């Protein structure tokens, strides 16, 4: 029986430098891990639009990518990708509580559309 494993990589501060270029040796290291029989995928806080280019640059063949801090899971569909799972919630309650306590703060909510 062949043993398989999964390696999940973050993007920011893990495979990328601050200038948004891949850290030296990342492409080669990912290829070595894949050649050793492991599946390599990305799991990141970034949106899919900001993640896809790194899936392509690294030549990843995994069928999934986890984006938006786990709120969106993308699944490969042939040569394209589809939203396989989207975790949503109504942010109004949380934003109301935060606004009461931190009225000068700014907040961002990512829309899955």
Segments (PLM) and residue ranges:
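Short, small/polar residue-rich loop motifs at catalytic or cofactor-binding pockets
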Residues: 2-4, 59-60
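Asp-based phosphoryl-transfer active-site loop
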Residues: 3-20, 42
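Active-site phosphate-binding/coordination module
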Residues: 24-113
């Amino acid at each position: 029986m062949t043993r398989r494993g999964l390696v999940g990589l973050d993007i920011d501060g893990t495979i990328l430098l601050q200038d948004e270029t891949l850290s030296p040796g990342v492409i080669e290291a990912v290829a070595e891990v894949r050649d050793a029989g492991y599946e390599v995928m990305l799991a990141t806080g970034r949106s899919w639009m900001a993640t896809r280019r790194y899936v392509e640059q690294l030549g990843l063949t995994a069928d999934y990518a986890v984006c938006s801090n786990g709120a969106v899971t993308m699944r490969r569909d042939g040569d394209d990708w589809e939203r396989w799972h989207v975790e949503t919630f109504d942010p109004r309650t949380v934003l109301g509580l935060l606004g009461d306590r931190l009225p000068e703060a700014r907040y961002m909510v990512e829309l899955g559309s």
